[in-house]
UniProtKB/Swiss-Prot annotation:
GO biological process, one term: translation
Biased composition range(s): Polar residues: 7-19
Location of region: Disordered: 1-25
GO function terms (MF aspect): structural constituent of ribosome
Record keywords: Ribonucleoprotein, Ribosomal protein
GO CC annotation terms, alphabetical: cytosolic large ribosomal subunit
Similarity section: Belongs to the bacterial ribosomal protein bL27 family.
Tagged with keyword Magnesium: no
Name by which UniProt lists this protein: Large ribosomal subunit protein bL27
Gene this chain is encoded by: rpmA
Superkingdom of source: Bacteria
Family annotation (PANTHER family): LARGE RIBOSOMAL SUBUNIT PROTEIN BL27M, RIBOSOMAL PROTEIN L27
């Protein structure tokens, strides 16, 4: 009869945290400058107009505006932020 307990699988029993990658702001959404648009590994989606790229390939808005996803050639995508229409921002004068 054994007098020691079995230790089991000591090399198992851990898991890494999820990286929470993906699109954070979708097409048609209004964003402010500095908002993160996409968290990604590598340039799966490329930066377009008014979009910056961080050192970890995160794409973020450089201006306030509306997010749009576009094609870049045949097999690539890009994300751009276009400014809001100037007429929508100005108050309407009462007569």
């Amino acid at each position: 009869m054994a007098h020691k307990k079995g230790t089991g699988s000591t090399r198992n029993g851990r898991d890494s945290n999820a990286q929470r990658l993906g699109v954070k702001r979708y097409g048609g959404e209004r964003v402010k400058a500095g908002n993160i648009l996409i968290r990604q590994r590598g340039t799966k989606i490329h930066p377009g107009a008014n979009v910056g790229r961080g050192s970890d390939d995160t794409l973020f808005a450089l201006i306030e505006g509306i997010v749009t996803f576009e094609r870049l050639g045949r097999d690539r995508k890009k994300v751009s932020v276009y400014p809001l229409a100037q007429t929508a921002m100005q108050p309407v004068a009462a007569e």
